C-alpha cells in the first residue's frame, strides 16, 4: 500500500509538471500617441507634404476661423532628421474645384525629384467666396466676400551633419467687415440705410491684409545616440500691411543647443538643452500724433516691443520614467516698462503599464506677444488701428494627463491645464463702430484659465477610422478692478468662447478606391454681446428716467447691448438670440487612377459658418466638387549632349 501511494504521488507530480507550460507573457505594445484637436475638424485645406506617405489625401473643409499661416516651423526636435531625402511616390499635384455658391478652389504643390543634397519646391493655395447672400436668413446680412491666397517657396541644402533650411511665404487675405444685419440699420437711426448696402460703401469697410514671411535656419542631423552637440538656429521675419495702412514688422531669432549622454551606464539617458528666443515687434499705426511746440507737425505713431527668453532644462530617463527640470527667464520690454515673469519648468512621466497607461504631470509657464498678425488670423474683422497690443504672461501653469491604449487599435488621451494668466486678450464687439460689425480687443488683468481635453481614436474595423474629441474651457477673473469686472456691459463674462466643445471625425476607405469622410463640431454655453434697438432714456431734474422724444413726440430709438448666453434664457425670460455653434459636413473621394482623383464635399450643413462672434451668418451651406491630378513619379532622364554630325558626301 505504501509503495502504491508513493507511485501515485510521483505520477501526480509528473502530470502537474507537464501541465505547467513555462513561458513569459509580455504586455509590450508600441504606442504612438495620436492627439487630435476638435478645432482641426473644420480646418481649411492644407497643402500636405507627400513625403510622409505614399497615399496622398486631399481633404477640404470650410473653417469657422481664418486659417493660421505662420511661417515659423514647429517645435524643434533634437536629432530627429535623417540626412537622406525620402523618395516620393508623387512629388507634385494640382487640385482644382468649384463650389456652390461661387467658391473656387485651386492648389498646386511641386517638389524636386529625389536628391541627396537638395530639396526645394513650392506650395500654392487659393480659396474664395463671391456669392451674394442666399436664402431667407442670409439675405438679412450685407454682401461680404472673402478670399485667401497663399504661396510658399522652400529650399533645403542637406550636408553630412547639418541641414540648411529656408522658406519664403506670402499670403493675401481679403475680408470685408462682417455682413451687418439689416435689423440694425433702421431709418430711425440711419437716415439712408440703403447706403450701407451699396458697393461703394462696402469697399470702404474692407479689412484686407498682406503677410510676407521669411525664414532661414541651420540644424544638425545628429541622432540622440550620438554624443555630439546638437543645435538648431533660425532667423525669421514677418511683415504685415493692412488695408488701413497699419504696419507690423516682426523679427525673431530662435536657438537651441542640446547634448545627450548615458545615465550612469545604465538603461537611461541625460538630456541637457538650452533654448534662446529673441523677438522684436515694431507697429506703425495710421492715426497721427501731434508733434512740435505748437502741435502743428503730425507723425504716424509707432510702438516697439521686445522680448528675450532663456530656458535651460535637464531631462533624465530610465526605462518608462522621465524627469525634466528647468527654468524660464523671459525679459519683456514695452511702453518704457520692463518685466521679468520667471516661471519654473518641471515634468514627470511614468509608464505605469507600458503602452497601456502612461501618466504625466508638470508645471511650466509662458510669455507671448499679442501681435497684429495673430489677431488678424484669428479674427480678421478687428477694427483698424487696434493699438492695445500687450504681452500675455503665465508664470504658473499646472498640467497633467493620462494616455495609452485600450486595445491595439484604440488610443486615448485625457489632459488638463490650470493656468494663472495676466493680460489675457478677448474679442469684444466694438460699440463705437457705426454698423456694429467690427471687433475690439480687451484684456483681463488677472485671472485663471482651466482647459480640459479628451480624445479617443479608434480603428473600428479595417479601413474605418473614428476620432472623438471633447473640451471644457473656462475662465475665472480675480482682479476686482480689471476690465471685465468694472465694465457693466460685459458683466464679467468671457465673450465668444464656448465653454463646451465636442467634435467628431471619421473616415472609411472601401476597396482602396472610395473614401468617405464625415465631421461634426458642436460648441455651446458661450456669452456674446448682442446689440438691440430700444428707446433712449434720460434722467430729468427729479432724477427719474424718462424716454427721449423727438419733435413729433415719438420715442427716439438707439442701440443698447445685452450679454446673452446660447443655452440660458435672458433675465426677462425671453429666449436668447445667440445660438450654439453647430457645423458638420461629409466628403467623398473616388480614386479613378493612381494619378486622378475626383472629390466632392458638403460643408457647413448646419449653416453656422462664421458665427463664432455672434450671429454674423455670412455663409450658408457650401458644396464643392473638383479633381486632383498627381504627377512627378516618372524617372528623370539625364540630358544628352548634342553632337554635331559630320556630313557625308
Walk through the language-model features, giving the residues of each.
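Surface-exposed extracellular loop regions of Gram-negative outer-membrane beta-barrel proteins
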Residues: 113-134, 268-286, 301-333, 463, ...
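Flexible loop and strand-edge segments within Gram-negative outer membrane beta-barrel domains
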Residues: 129-132, 138-146, 165-230, 234-250
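Residues on the lipid-exposed face of transmembrane beta-strands in outer-membrane beta-barrel proteins
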Residues: 108-112, 122, 151-157, 214-222, ...
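Hydrophobic h-region of N-terminal signal peptides that target proteins for export
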Residues: 10-18
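N-terminal periplasmic/intermembrane-space "pro-region" immediately following the signal or transit peptide
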Residues: 19-84, 642-649
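Outer-membrane beta-barrel translocator/receptor signature
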Residues: 75-76, 85-94, 98-136, 145-149
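Exposed, low-structure sequence patches enriched in small/polar residues
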Residues: 89, 94-97, 322-324, 330-649
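Outer-membrane beta-barrel transmembrane domain signature of Gram-negative proteins
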Residues: 203-219, 234, 239-321
